[in-house]
Amino acid sequence: MRISGLLLMVLALGHLLVMHLMGTGAERINFGFVAVRWASPFWRTWDWMLLMLALVHGINGLRNITLDYVQRPGLRLTINMLSYVIGFTLMVLGTIIVVTFDPSKWPGAV
């Protein structure tokens, strides 16, 4: 988790710098901006890695909180399994969106 945490920090700070601090800031972010940005495999990979690492980091944090505060083994297992299922579902949906995003299928949006 330490290495992924460091990588997550680099990705998140890079995201904040590029998306919110450079240029005119967050006002420029719209569908067209994302479409142009995601035309590059570099930015798709960057955003996908940011999403995956954030989800893994968050799910691991929930697991640690559950292990610390939930005493009943059955409830602990239920909460952890629910967290894993939700996290996996979000990972699959996020991957589908990043991989299949095509602005040409949104007429009039760009």
Go through each PLM region and give its residues.
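Membrane-embedded alpha-helical bundles that constitute the cytochrome b-like, heme-associated redox core
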Residues: 1-110
